[in-house]
Amino acid sequence: MQDIQLDKRLSELLSQAVTPHNAQPLMQALCQSLNEHNIRYYVDDAPSITDSEYDRLMQRLKQLEAEYPQFVAADSPTQRVGGMALAKFEQITHLKPMLSLDNAFDEADFSAFHKRVSDRVGEVSFCCEPKLDGLAVSILYRNGVLERAATRGDGTVGEDITENVKTIKSIPLKLRGDNYPELVEVRGEAFMPKAAFEALNERARLKDEKLFVNPRNAAAGSLRQLDSKITASRALSFYAYALGVVEPTSHELAKTHYEQLQQLKSWGLPVSSEIKVCDELSQVFAYYQDILTRRSYLPFEIDGVVMKVNDIAQQQTLGFVAKSPRWAIAYKFPAQEEMTLLEGVDFQVGRTGAVTPVARLKPVFVGGVTVSNATLHNADEIERLGVMVGDTVIIRRAGDVIPQIVAIVPERRPEDAKAIAFPQHCPVCGSLVERLEGEAVTRCSGGLFCEAQRKEAIKHFASRKALDIDGMGDKIVEQLIDKELVQSPADLFKLPASMMTMLDRMGMKSATNLAQAIEAAKTTTLPRFLYALGIREVGEATASNLATHFGSLEALRVATIEQLIQVEDIGEVVAQHVAHFFAQPHNLEVIDALIAAGVNWPTIAAPSADEQPLKGQTWVLTGTLNQLNRNDAKAQLQALGAKVAGSVSKNTDCLVAGEAAGSKLAKAQELGVKVIGEDELLALLANS
């Protein structure tokens, strides 16, 4: 009801002509509305207006504040963008010390903590929450308005980071409602979500700037910027985890820690959705294992879970020791970062030909396992890290992610450290390795010839969208190669049925059927053949465009990059990949062997204008089609000259909407794009 009254009052004020007399109440109503919508978005996860509506209200407030600066409120959402840069941070003495937590590293440690607690206060339940890997922050609200914010510092004295904290969108500048204390201190963790961290490092990488090692360092560095505009650009977030000082002390608060967190949430403060109350020791251990299992999938970094006695009266009975509360403990996960020695580098060749440097490490226990290898990704990463053989390095292992080197320890570099040099030839097949301009990855040029790429190349060659060899599944391909019956795609067409009976669970009847399917696959189309070759960046549509444009394999084999760029939807990068593929003798040998084995296709006649009525049009498919599969529909539209895109835009000519069409249909309707159903599509294809 209050929300309806707020919206109604704002609508009334917005409908009036603005004068010096009504500007202030209008600005106050806009602030109140925008702050409420911020909380609905960041805390309740239930936005009630669109982003464009929010932006419109924000723009109106900015215009009014520019015209009437004397009425700018301290809790205005416009104040989040950051103000003047500071010369230094002022010191703040905490009203109540911000203590650290004792740690538990295994079940025995936590069981001992549980015994100490229950011996003092009897039966207990715990409020369990993820231990965020960020920066502890104290935020003070007076009469509901954010007054100041500080870092934890040494627990007694921290730094004033008020202006920086105001830029964090999930932190309300004014508390929601009116049932909060006159003065309330909120404690929580400021952190950088994983997605924001990746985006920050990507921007730094593009500018050739130093990268942050992990989200915790990024969050700490962002909060301690003297220029709050920099903090505002860093997409920090915040979760409240406790109440600090409350005045007057007579203000009624919830009786359990969990309920107090819900109280904070009702005031508009974000609280983790992963919090849970556990009544039994077994439930605590199950919670720990659950969060540990899901750790790598959470949107933020954590390094353990925090267990707090849930009952506030029991907390008060237990009290504190010098540096930590007796009623809480951090149950830490196995370390994800450790230091070790880089003893050497090996080079591996992946299924796509990527040559990847793999660091050989002095074995070290990290992330719950012993690690002796870590990826170095590519030459750019080696250069960025400045890493050499013999260096002491920091390695990181997060969940199921392959361990990686994230930094070196320069002061420990020995005098005989050696630079890491990429090989000039593929360590598997001996072909030249090459790195195309603009690419980070170095690749083997062996293509279809390279043993490291062989299995995946032949699986792709036989797949449904390529030569479509019925019955030639992945396991069959793997057996053929493991038993050395096949070394290149052309060898498939030389296999007699009798030889295929050597495969596991392959009788003569099955072998005969497979041999017949291989024989049938000899007759194909040029687009399918080109797609089957596995040229980088050449999918079905590109293969079709190449075949249509050049008309023959012979013409395509000798095409220059300049000629390739003339093909529809082919840019310089794809043109380089195609030209590079046909320049490799190994690949030409495989193609010649395939043709000698009898692989053939009909001659392509250049389509007339009448045969391509959709030329120049962009179509999009969405939803489930019942009578056509998506690939067939796409291929038939392309044959009629249409470009089939993956998303709807103002340039889309038509959307084909099947069953359960979602956001693409809504966007098409919003943009006024023509929409047809599957029946209309079938009629169009039948008449073309």
UniProtKB/Swiss-Prot annotation:
Record InterPro entries: BRCT_dom, BRCT_dom_sf, DisA/LigA_HHH, DNA_ligase, DNA_ligase_AS, DNA_ligase_CS, DNAligase_adenylation, DNAligase_N
Chain coiled-coil ranges: none
EC top class named in words: ligase
Gene Ontology CC annotations of this record: cytosol
Catalytic activity: NAD(+) + (deoxyribonucleotide)n-3'-hydroxyl + 5'-phospho-(deoxyribonucleotide)m = (deoxyribonucleotide)n+m + AMP + beta-nicotinamide D-nucleotide
Keywords, in A-Z order: DNA damage, DNA repair, DNA replication, Ligase, Magnesium, Manganese, Metal-binding, NAD, Zinc
Pfam families from the UniProt entry: BRCT, DNA_ligase_aden, DNA_ligase_OB, DNA_ligase_ZBD, HHH_2
Cofactor: Mg(2+); Mn(2+)
Domain of life assignment: Bacteria
Record-linked SUPFAM superfamilies: BRCT domain (SSF52113), DNA ligase/mRNA capping enzyme, catalytic domain (SSF56091), Nucleic acid-binding proteins (SSF50249), RuvA domain 2-like (SSF47781)
GO annotation (BP), single: DNA repair
Gene3D superfamilies: 5' to 3' exonuclease, C-terminal subdomain, 6.20.10.30, BRCT domain, DNA ligase/mRNA capping enzyme, Helix hairpin bin, Nucleic acid-binding proteins
Listed NCBIfam families: dnlj (TIGR00575), PRK07956.1 (NF005932)
Family statement drawn from the similarity comment of this UniProt entry: Belongs to the NAD-dependent DNA ligase family. LigA subfamily.
Protein name: DNA ligase
Source species taxonomy: Bacteria, Pseudomonadati, Pseudomonadota, Gammaproteobacteria, Alteromonadales
Underlying gene: ligA
